[in-house]
Amino acid sequence: MSGNGVHGVHGALQLLRSLPKVSLANLRPNPGSKKPERRRGRGRYRGRKCGRGHKGERQRGNRPRLGFEGGQTPFYLSIPKYGFNEGHSCRRKYHPLSLQKLQYLIDLGRVDPTQPIDLTQLTNARGVTVQPLKRDYGVQLVEEGADIFAAKINIEVQRASELAIAAIEKNGGVVTASFYDPRSLEILIRPVPFFLRGQPIPKRMLPPEDLVRYYTDASNRGYLADPSKVAEARLELAKKYGYTLPDITKDELFKMLSTRKDPRQIFFGLAPGWIVNMADKKILKPTDERLLKYYSS
């Protein structure tokens, strides 16, 4: 058996030595792997019509325009259009921020729950990416992770779902929905480059007409809503979802939880018209009466 195996190996080696070497010159496709190409001139007209058929508009040089259906009313005119995507490029976009991700950022220490939270803290924590030049108008708080959210926070977002509001207020937190115009939004998410330019902080613009109803509605926790109606809406939401609403006035963090921005204010603790001097680490405040009247209006 061993002798036959040795002779078999030697025989195979001798056969390989006698065969030509594999190169680009002797490579061929496997039999049947390629179909023979059909040469021109083998069809009905034997190549005399150049593949255009016999007479007619298609045989000559001009072709009908795209959508032409031989004279009858074309499809795109007979079927009425409906504006499914009307104004799509002008719609405001809000990036979703789930309660699960917010709790994750708090657990990692990227977001400090003992301080008011707005877009500046969320973007610095790499929790959201907002691009005002692409029609982004902020973030929307969604209810994913409401069952595991356990932080007591004072957060300002642009939109929030009802269940997300209930999950935060159940823990003794506060939610505020605020509007920022594109310029104010750009300053809010990138404050340092703005401060380095040495410009006064501008006034935040009020919401457009189609958003006034949303931000004046207490059920949405709008920043333009009546505070007394917001307190009533908090109690109604607690009854709806069956939890006891904590009394934040007796909380040790009541000062932080009750912190609000003025409707014209962009940053917490910085009023419109102030200039932040990054080099000297100072804040310059206007003293002229006309400037004070303008920025307070």
Swiss-Prot record:
<feature type="transit peptide" description="Mitochondrion">
    <location>
        <begin position="1"/>
        <end position="21"/>
    </location>
</feature>
<dbReference type="GO" id="GO:0006412">
    <property type="term" value="P:translation"/>
</dbReference>
<keyword id="KW-0689">Ribosomal protein</keyword>
<dbReference type="InterPro" id="IPR005749">
    <property type="entry name" value="Ribosomal_uL15_bac-type"/>
</dbReference>
<dbReference type="Pfam" id="PF00828">
    <property type="entry name" value="Ribosomal_L27A"/>
</dbReference>
<feature type="region of interest" description="Disordered">
    <location>
        <begin position="23"/>
        <end position="69"/>
    </location>
</feature>
<dbReference type="InterPro" id="IPR030878">
    <property type="entry name" value="Ribosomal_uL15"/>
</dbReference>
<keyword id="KW-0809">Transit peptide</keyword>
<comment type="similarity">
    <text>Belongs to the universal ribosomal protein uL15 family.</text>
</comment>
<protein>
    <recommendedName>
        <fullName>Large ribosomal subunit protein uL15m</fullName>
    </recommendedName>
</protein>
<comment type="subunit">
    <text>Component of the mitochondrial ribosome large subunit (39S) which comprises a 16S rRNA and about 50 distinct proteins.</text>
</comment>
<feature type="compositionally biased region" description="Basic residues">
    <location>
        <begin position="36"/>
        <end position="53"/>
    </location>
</feature>
<keyword id="KW-0687">Ribonucleoprotein</keyword>
<dbReference type="GO" id="GO:0005762">
    <property type="term" value="C:mitochondrial large ribosomal subunit"/>
</dbReference>
<dbReference type="InterPro" id="IPR036227">
    <property type="entry name" value="Ribosomal_uL15/eL18_sf"/>
</dbReference>
<dbReference type="InterPro" id="IPR021131">
    <property type="entry name" value="Ribosomal_uL15/eL18"/>
</dbReference>
<dbReference type="GO" id="GO:0003735">
    <property type="term" value="F:structural constituent of ribosome"/>
</dbReference>
<keyword id="KW-0496">Mitochondrion</keyword>
